[in-house]
UniProtKB/Swiss-Prot annotation:
Substrate binds at R75, Y215, G216, G217, S267, N386, S387, R388. Its EC number is 4.1.1.32. Its cofactor is Mn(2+). Monomer. It comes from Neocallimastix frontalis. Belongs to the phosphoenolpyruvate carboxykinase [GTP] family. This is Phosphoenolpyruvate carboxykinase [GTP].
């Protein structure tokens, strides 16, 4: 039978299924084949169970809405662990517990936890099946919601089993909602066990176990758990690879020459918007390879090549509109799973920021409560601030053909950036690869008044990887630095830093969105070695006067002056903040990184 364990021949997988079923005692076992028919059947099952609502087939063909438990709505960093053999290998940015202690805890929670449920076995490939940068995982879960989302987010099914063959290896990813069902017991519409959430990575074993949560980032284990936390470990072991929280975009100039750029930004800095940008400058075209994760590897030619290991977008819905990101909106017009957004009277979805006006008629909020604009009741959050859409990469109208390339795409430039109201210029280029690593290690965003910390405080998020690095971040900086020693720096990507968010008296100085293509144009011209377009400053290379293409753009010269000037005095206090942050890594902070920061300080002092 196609979906029974008898269809499995891989030795590691057979042992994994046996060990999992003996511990968790499911009522039956189902091996996923990744077919459209299977997806349809599971969605129908989820509708029957009350977990999915089918949306209006005319407005949103083949789309469904799910509502989670109100307490299970986001990644939970406090419940996320890197259980390395030694505590120092997890480092100061990760939670740690001794592996033996964690396993005892998990085994206690998982004994019989799938009682009355089906155990789904999901063989998946991160990246094109059989590609040199791609890797395989198998997720075992008791959640059909996880299965259908994984079928969008990764390449699932028989081809992966064929690739594994008898002796192939994979990363085992075990997930359970920890909600066993007794005979005749009515099931919940969102099984979870909030008080027992653990999202655990065992780096030496290349193994993931996540229990208690049914939510995306905690339950779709191919995503952050594998594609970043375990993949950072695998990449360092390989010695020639990186696994990064980066978008990948293709940019073609008017002469038809194409380049690829990766970019890492902390959350709420517009990563998906940049990945799906519509360029505003004539003759330039931007296409999307991926919006969240990049796996990179040095190719035979000495260049760094990248793949998007995912096959879908798990996008934040609120704030996404036809104005802010038309391509993201088009990508979720069909074949999409929505989680925790509002349901309109005509069977469509809505979220804050989608349109100026709230739709007329009755709306069911993400909490399943009825509300309407004319009810006289104050408007609640109709969609949860972290509500999501899960859509296929193929749906995006600006998809880049490089997404399908087995060997990936060659990367010419890397961008880091944060949300900074002052000090940090619109764009600058690092002086070298090692100086670029300093930029990555000091990525930061200012907290807003809405955050718990005082407004204007810096929250550092090195490489935008703070919650996602699977080993000690000091070692991670050292591994990045090693690329300059091991490889020809001339062939490595040029590194840049951007900041779209400079303000003056509360007013943004740069229009952002599609106009950011003007900054990408300058970056590509720097990659091409165009003369006379950059000026050297203590922090790196900035656009020379007149070098940024501002044609047809109405930005006052005084504003451009502000965002393209280095305030050395303000930057010296920046250096102090970076030094203070770096001190948390103690003796594992690489000396070469300290030397880069010292040199930056000297250049700034000399320029005063």
């Amino acid at each position: 039978m196609a979906h029974s364990v008898s269809s499995v021949v891989n030795k590691q997988l057979l042992a994994y299924i046996k060990e999992s079923s003996e511990l968790m005692t499911p009522k039956d076992i189902y091996v996923c084949d990744g077919s459209a028919e299977e997806y349809h059947n599971l969605c129908e099952l989820l509708v029957k169970q009350g977990i999915f609502t089918k949306l209006n087939e005319t407005k949103r063909p083949n789309c469904y809405l799910a509502r989670s438990n109100p307490a299970d709505v986001a990644r939970v960093e406090k419940c996320t662990y890197i259980c390395s053999e030694k505590e120092e290998d997890a480092g100061p940015t990760n939670n740690w517990m001794a592996p033996a202690e964690m396993k005892a805890k998990l085994n206690g929670l998982m004994k019989g936890c799938m009682k009355g449920r089906t155990m789904y076995v999901i063989p998946f490939s991160m990246g094109p099946i059989g590609g040199p940068i791609s890797r395989v995982g198998v997720e075992i879960t008791d959640s059909p919601y996880v299965v259908v989302n994984m079928c969008i987010m990764a390449k699932v099914g028989k081809k992966v089993l064929d690739l594994l063959g008898v002796d192939g290896t994979f990363v085992p990813c075990t997930h359970s909602c920890l909600a066993p069902l007794e005979e005749g017991q009515k099931d919940s519409t969102w099984p979870c066990n909030i008080d027992n959430r653990y999202i655990v990575q065992f780096p030496e074993e290349h193994r993931i176990v996540s229990v208690g949560s049914g939510y995306g980032g905690n339950a779709l284990l191919g995503k952050k758990c594998y594609a970043l936390r375990i993949a950072t470990v695998l990449s360092r072991e390989a010695g020639d690879s990186l696994a990064e929280h980066m978008l990948i975009l293709g940019i073609t100039n008017p002469q038809g020459k194409k380049y690829y750029i990766t970019a890492a930004f902390p959350s709420a800095c517009g990563k998906t918007n940049l990945a799906m940008l519509n360029a505003t400058i004539p003759g330039w075209k931007i296409e999307c390879v991926g919006d969240d994760i990049a796996w990179l590897k040095i190719g035979k030619d000495g260049r760094l090549w990248a793949i998007n290991p995912e096959s879908g977008f798990f996008g934040v819905a609120p704030g996404t509109s036809y104005k802010s990101n038309p391509n993201a909106m088009k990508s979720c017009e069909k074949d999409t799973i929505f989680t925790n957004v509002a349901l309109t009277e005509d069977g469509d979805v809505w979220w804050e920021g989608m349109t100026k006006e709230v739709p007329k008629g009755k709306i069911i909020t993400w909490l399943g409560k009825e509300w309407s604009a004319d009810s006289g009741e104050p408007k609640p959050n109709l969609a949860h601030p972290n509500s999501r859409f899960t859509a296929r990469v193929e749906n995006v109208p600006v998809g880049d053909p490089g997404y399908y390339a087995l060997e990936g795409v060659p990367v010419s430039a890397m961008i880091f950036g944060g949300r900074r109201e002052n000090t940090v210029p619109l764009v600058f280029q690092s002086r070298s690869w090692k100086h670029g690593v300093l930029l990555g290690s000091s990525v930061a965003s200012e907290t807003t008044a809405a955050a718990e910390a005082a407004a204007g405080q810096l929250r550092f998020d090195p490489f935008a990887m703070l919650p996602f690095c699977g080993y000690n971040m000091g070692d991670y900086f050292g591994y990045w630095l090693s690329f300059a020693d091991k490889y020809d720096e001339a062939k490595l990507p040029k590194i840049f830093h951007v900041n779209w968010f400079r303000k003056d008296n509360g007013r943004f100085l740069w229009p952002g969105y599609g106009e950011n293509s003007r900054v990408l144009k300058w970056i590509i011209e720097r990659v091409e070695g165009k003369e006379g377009i950059a000026k050297e400053t203590p922090i790196g290379y900035l656009p020379a006067k007149g070098a940024l293409d501002l044609s047809g753009l109405d930005v006052p010269e005084a504003d451009m002056e502000k965002i393209l000037t280095v305030d050395c005095k303000a930057y010296l206090s920046e250096v102090e903040k970076i030094r203070q942050y770096h001190s948390k890594f103690g003796s594992l902070l690489p000396k070469a990184l300290i030397a880069e920061l010292d040199a930056l300080e000297q250049r700034l002092k000399a320029a005063l």
